[in-house]
């Protein structure tokens, strides 16, 4: 019962699933979704529902609904019915129908009585309103307009139609679903209307009920139809605005309509004239070609835009021929069979293109040009071609299926009805498919094994290596097509090569294939439709030599010219080109029929226009190759001719008799750009401007157009955002800078900016209006004539006549001289001066400026020259500012300093007169007051004299009075007289106080004497007391005097101290003021630094914390893992691979790298793996150089010996074996770890302890025990011998192409560890030939492939050793002015001829790969040496321009020897490396026996070296020229006739150093433009001295940038600083050869090893034999090993196969096609391995490190192999979308991020 229930339940579920997935349900669902695509047609339907009432309203509702449903039904039927779909889907039909109907409907609703025929009944047909409602809803439903932004809902039905088988049922069900949705929608609208009617709050609105607005409401109801029509019209206009206008469309001319391009559009037989139907080469080129009809007479070709096939319709009318070749009638008549469409083509095509040109540029796309490819492919062209194919044994839809093959299958099915493949079950097919792939792998493996076994048998190279196929167009000379044009190498080409002469390839290739019988196509009858037989023909043996090559040349090269061809020659030519012969098995006769010959190819929609921009038209560079009318809008610009050279420079011009060349003038022109915003932005004319990217404009004249995406990066307005940081900056700036002077300067700067902006606006305004330039130009010329010849002469006459009336001398001569000095120079619109008489070209339309030099200003009088001194004039100029002696004329006759600037203030004529009058009046006023001034002066003198006399008399009177008193005192008291006088004399000098005391005592004594004369005793006592007091006073005074003298002496000493301290204080004060003044800058600097540090700290907080966290966790985990391991470490050798240069950058930047090995780059992983122990490195060699699952068992014991000698193996590992792992190992190991997301412990176990410690270091620390001397200097010869193989095989490879695609394609052939060797293995080239063509010259860089990283070069000093010039002065003469073009190439190639003899004059390393990285990064570039040695400037500039051509030995060797500079240098040298005896003894201590045993080639002399290097350089340049695009070469050929040496030099410079950009110094831009303006004027003048001097004084012409020398050099320009050469930063693509070379060729040698060991190591070596491969490399074997000759030069054995087979071999090996279990192993493979005699024995006792390395190796190698496949899928699998390998990327990289 339970089983029955489950059975019923299962049936119900399956039934439900079937119902849900049925066509009906899906159609109902999609139809219901279509209802929500609401368009303008709903407006009519809703209007009929809402507005119309009554019986007529009901009929209108019914008709509207019926029309709406009928229109939708027609849309659904058009999906299924193709004619209706074409009618409704064509844009021009809808456009033609929509516009007239919209106009009719608009006028219908605006004119009410348009169809009013009076009183008619309701049901009569005269009343067309109901019919119009039906038509409105029907037609507007077909217009497919959408109000919603996306129309995806309406197109869902169209999309699902591609997946549905029962299409009619699906269309019906989808229509029913739409009808259900429509009914529901209309019911919902009805419910909303009922709700509105029932809701009183809406109906009882005050506005509606009020009487005031009743009239407005009624008018609104009456005019609803008009409102609806207006809304509908606006919607339709908006919709039509998104598409281009059908009539006023810019019609672009196709390439066939333009002259000079017909020859380019040849049939695609340039590389393969008759490609087979299945050849990929023909297919690739056929994709390019457009469909053309070729007329037989060669008159014209018609380019048809609809298809791109090549059709040839011919009717061959001949008589049957017998088998033996007897001709009955040999006349062949060719005539064109016209189709029916050709009769009305002249009418139909112009009408269609008038309405809508479907091939023009509708979208405003960018037109990306390509000089080497013709018309570009349309963007809407899908690169995919879908067809069914077998993949994994099952039928699948392939998106890259070859379209030719699908077309072929379709044709076969039509011709052979039984051509149907029986479908078999999927499992047998799948197994069969996998078996086929397995069989392919086995066959490839067997072939590979056979070729390797042939190596042991010492076969020749030709029998071992698989040949690659190249396209040869000259077998005799072995000339091949360039790799970029080789279809075998380049792959699919999407463009046609320009101007390849097709007759060369046709004549040479066809001659080879057609000397026998004509081409017979066996399956031709199956593919072509044969309707009737016209004639019979036998196989004709014809010789192609009988064809006239001259006729072929004329036929192909000049198709435009009419040419008569004889009938026989015409027969032969077209028989040669178009005969196709068919075979019949039953009949001996051959039938030639009317043939429709279709080239089976893919339709590639290609733009039929080859457009040029307006700027290119203005420049006029490509007038021969481009149409006359530009198709791309450029920035608004005008071509202004500034100089026209009417006299030819060379005699070539005089000999030309061509009318075009004779009429053509040599013009020099400048492009004047408009200053307003460039809104056109290189869009193509006729494209929809409204569909361009939206741009934000907030100013009327805006400098640049900004996208909304980047608008936030601009300075916003205040209402857009509030920038707090900007406000802080402004506040700080205002706070720090409060200087008034700087504020004034800022205001002046802002004012000048505003003035400049105003001038630009005025100029653009004049340039934008129609006829404005004509009006302005005529006004300017009128003002110039009026000023020069009417106004100024009239003013001169009036002035001089007035002077004569005032009885003054007239100044006719001075005024006329100034008037004649004034010059009116005609200038272009932007101010370039021409001359007085020459007007600019098209000056009425382009604009004109008139510049007045030395303008005339009327002066009332002229001063003499000696009146105003020079100092006064200088002072005036300093005060008033420098005043220019020129101006520009305005429209109103005013003068401005700059065009469109504000008017200048003229020097006033009345102002000097008024100043002179003021002076005269002032003088007149001062005369009456002159007497008073003199009297006043005399009165002051008299008063001074009287005052002095008065003082003198008073002094004398007092003196006499004093004398009288003294005499009286002496007579009365004689005893006291002398003492008083003495006292007075003493005290007068000492102090005033003592004098006062003595005077008082004397007065008291006199008074006492007068009153008491009788008392003698009292007198005596008084006298005694007086004497005592006087003596006491004298003693006190003497003591005080002594104290005063002592104090004075002390004060003098202290005064010096005070003065010195005062000086110190003054200096301190001065320093303090300076410190205060400068503290502002210091505070500002500190604030800025602090803010930056805070900002960076905030940013880096998260990163620092996470980094510290992960580092701490890693350290803890590492300690935990290795806690129990052995700590003791043995001293092992280190093998450092000098790996890819990007690793050096990575280490020098001191970046810390985590253990996430999947996320590391492949180069870094290999570099770090090289630092493991020697025992592990031996296994790494197997990983790096051999494929894991196949080639490892080919490793023999001799290779181990070789590695042991190199220090890669230890001696104990001599008998150990390589590990032979399979691809399944890494799969099994990775299956256990989901998505490689391993824990930290598992990741850490993959690496050794020493590697773990190394990887956590900040930078690479070199081992101090390893010295550069051991690694380079002591092993120079050994390295030479070790590198002999690599140089002989890898350096001689042909140069890669310069094109990016070709380099990618070649890189696909190489893969990681593989190198593409040359097939030619001859070792006849000497070793010296390889010196110039070094690894640095390999094309490892995209685009040029010759530049190596500059950081390896020690460019502190450039030292040169001149082999053939003893004295440097006559060779490099800095003062000579010879033509530089002749000596440039020779001088610049001297750097290639540098020998290694005297590379260093000091003890400095010229090159240092180990230690120069950090030093060069911090090294300052100085050129002070060149000031004293100008001879070296040439070589220094040489290195700057061409740093990549450096011999390889200079990078591998260091020279630390001191060479005496004063020692006499001789030219004779015994060998290449010998510079002196000491050096040769030290480095090359080799005996003759050793040289003979090694078989080393003796180094050649310097002459041969020089010749070899020159030949290598010439070959290099030849290859570069060969790989260069032929179109550019032809363009260059057209311009080879240079008019001057400067032009030739510039062309040579740009061709040789095109990867270095030549940039002006930014400071010279304005100076150069100013100089050009002055030059244009000076060239036209006969005596330009005066104007030249004045322009120099004004600063218009700068003398520092003048090229005084006629033949200047680029080195001089760089020395002056005018030109700056900047190398373009190109990405490096590392070559596999370089990796192997650095891995094996260079290895460090331990310092403890003796020199004897180094010299003895390579005593036994093999000799070179040109016939065998094993002699191309010198073997390195020990004494104990027998000298057995085996072949080990193929480090990657896969190189035996061709690149194509090599790729297939790798893919089959990397992907295992069998479904195996996790532990399944390939038993057959193991069995084969054990049977081989060279298999290395395995051992079970693997140590821990070996097991870890096995896991690491099995994980890394296939992982990165998949990465390479993912990167190269574009070229291997013909897919350009990288997302196809997204799943691989997901599984390759772990989830946790890198910190």
UniProtKB/Swiss-Prot annotation:
Membrane-protein topology: Multi-pass membrane protein
The entry's keywords: Chloroplast, Membrane, Plastid, Plastid inner membrane, Protein transport, Transmembrane, Transmembrane helix, Transport
GO cellular component: chloroplast inner membrane
Polar residues: compositionally biased ranges: 1508-1517
Protein location: Plastid, Chloroplast inner membrane
Transmembrane segments annotated in the record for this chain: 19-39, 68-88, 91-111, 133-153, 176-196, 227-247
Quaternary context: Part of the Tic complex.
Note: There is a partial copy of the N-terminus (positions 1-343) of ycf1 in the inverted repeat (BAF50335).
Function summary: Involved in protein precursor import into chloroplasts. May be part of an intermediate translocation complex acting as a protein-conducting channel at the inner envelope.
Listed name of the protein: Protein TIC 214
